[in-house]
């Protein structure tokens, strides 16, 4: 073995997360008590007992991280974010707390429309500047990879501007970004009463322009009574797939609308939200091997019920991923630790199932085969936590405990922490 670039030692355990979502989550996390982790050239090079390290693996240039008895796991992967936007909507937050609903605010011209106005007015440079602190907060939570959606442009120029900002942002932060086109987030004000014209704009102009520049890996649609119909979503997502963008769907969040069945029909990568999913929808998703992405922070933020039925989803055999859905309107929070806690308290998952969802489950949803686990050859993305067990993360609600965050073998975050209680 060549000399390691980085070695993490003195761990309580290392979670390599080598298992499958079809087995018991506690087993799928594959804990290695007292193991060390070695990284070389941005990849995992060794996981095992320290005594098993080959002679010469640790040299003068090896950075040695003392885990101080904390556990080590893969970097978190956030499969659902809206990191790039301008403006803020704290006034709407206050209105909701006085009884206004999300749909009432949207119909009055607030909601997504207000963020669209601010994002259209911002330059690409300003969008990058505004998003950089959000990436830092995600990194401090232990997130090393995040999906990022557009969707606050709703016109050709601004959707391109947002995705170019995502690309630029990825050169300025250690956080790895996976771009998704969400031009079908809402029908913009100027197309009110002309929704078919907007659907055609998405299909005939926005999608081809994004594909020409290679700006998005995925294409998403918000399928809902207040957004896009199943038929409209089918047309947009099929057009995106023809251009190389894999479908993702905002599905069955506010009403039962057939979005889960559509995700299954299209063989989508994910169906996200699923607060209103039916048993028939779950069966369709399971049969089509679609990942369910839970975003409980938004359910909390909107003061809605029910939460997505995580227990039923998991028991139906679906791979479950867990995201923050950080966005200015329905989940202004980069707190992965809070999402883990809510997944247990409100979605009905065990601590192991929630941890799987934030690591390997999320990586699978993005098609990232070498992320979200720690086996030799995988991405050198890992987190050294200040607590001895992953079970402490959802229990200590909203507290990250990410003491050292490593991205591609380099330390991206180092935070002073003593103990975990």
Swiss-Prot record:
GO CC term (a single one): cytoplasm
Gene Ontology biological process terms from the UniProt entry: L-histidine catabolic process to glutamate and formamide; L-histidine catabolic process to glutamate and formate
Enzyme Commission designation: 3.5.2.7
Source organism, top-level taxon: Bacteria
Keyword Metal-binding: yes
Keyword set includes Cytoplasm: yes
Cysteines joined through disulfide linkages: none
Residues at which N-formimidoyl-L-glutamate binds: 152, 327, 329
Pathway listed: Amino-acid degradation; L-histidine degradation into L-glutamate; N-formimidoyl-L-glutamate from L-histidine: step 3/3
Textual note on the cofactor: Binds 1 zinc or iron ion per subunit.
Keywords: Cytoplasm, Histidine metabolism, Hydrolase, Iron, Metal-binding, Zinc
Catalytic reactions on record: 4-imidazolone-5-propanoate + H2O = N-formimidoyl-L-glutamate
Protein name: Imidazolonepropionase
Organism: Myxococcus xanthus (strain DK1622)
Gene behind the chain: hutI
């Amino acid at each position: 073995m060549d000399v390691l670039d980085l070695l993490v030692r003195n761990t309580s355990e290392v979670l390599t997360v080598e298992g499958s979502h079809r087995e018991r989550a506690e087993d799928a996390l594959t804990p290695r008590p007292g193991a060390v982790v070695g990284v070389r050239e941005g990849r995992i090079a060794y996981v095992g007992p320290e005594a098993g390290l080959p002679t010469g693996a640790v040299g003068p240039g090896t950075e040695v991280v003392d885990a101080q008895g904390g556990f080590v796991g893969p970097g978190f992967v956030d499969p659902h974010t809206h990191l790039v936007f301008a403006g803020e909507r704290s006034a709407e937050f206050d209105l909701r707390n006085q009884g206004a609903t999300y749909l009432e605010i949207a119909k009055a011209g607030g909601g997504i429309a207000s963020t669209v106005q601010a994002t259209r007015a911002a330059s690409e440079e300003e969008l990058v500047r505004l998003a950089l602190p959000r990436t830092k907060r995600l990194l401090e939570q232990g997130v090393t990879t995040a999906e990022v959606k557009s969707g606050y442009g709703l016109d050709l120029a601004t959707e391109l501007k947002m995705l170019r900002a995502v690309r630029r942002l990825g050169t300025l932060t250690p956080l790895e970004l996976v771009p998704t086109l969400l031009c079908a987030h809402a029908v913009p004000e100027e197309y009110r009463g002309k929704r078919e014209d907007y659907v055609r704009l998405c299909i005939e102009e926005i999608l081809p322009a994004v594909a020409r520049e290679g700006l998005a890996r995925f294409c998403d649609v918000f399928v809902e009574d207040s957004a896009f119909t199943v038929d409209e979503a089918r047309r947009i997502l099929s057009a995106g797939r023809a251009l190389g963008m894999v479908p993702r769907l905002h599905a069955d969040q506010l009403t039962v609308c057939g979005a889960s069945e559509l995700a299954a029909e299209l063989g989508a990568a994910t169906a996200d939200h699923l607060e209103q999913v039916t048993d028939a929808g779950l069966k369709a998703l399971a049969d089509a091997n679609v990942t369910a992405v839970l975003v409980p922070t938004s359910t909390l933020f909107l003061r809605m019920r029910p939460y997505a039925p995580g227990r039923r989803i998991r028991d139906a055999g679906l791979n479950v991923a867990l995201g923050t859905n950080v966005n200015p309107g329905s989940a202004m929070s980069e707190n992965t630790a809070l999402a883990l806690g809510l997944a247990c308290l409100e979605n009905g998952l065990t601590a192991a199932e929630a941890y799987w969802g934030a690591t390997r489950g999320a990586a699978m949803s993005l098609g990232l085969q070498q992320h979200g686990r720690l086996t030799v050859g995988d991405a050198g993305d890992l987190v050294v936590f200040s607590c001895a067990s992953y079970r402490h993360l959802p229990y200590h609600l909203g507290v990250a405990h990410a003491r050292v965050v490593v991205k591609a073998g380099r330390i991206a975050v180092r935070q002073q922490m003593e103990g975990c209680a």
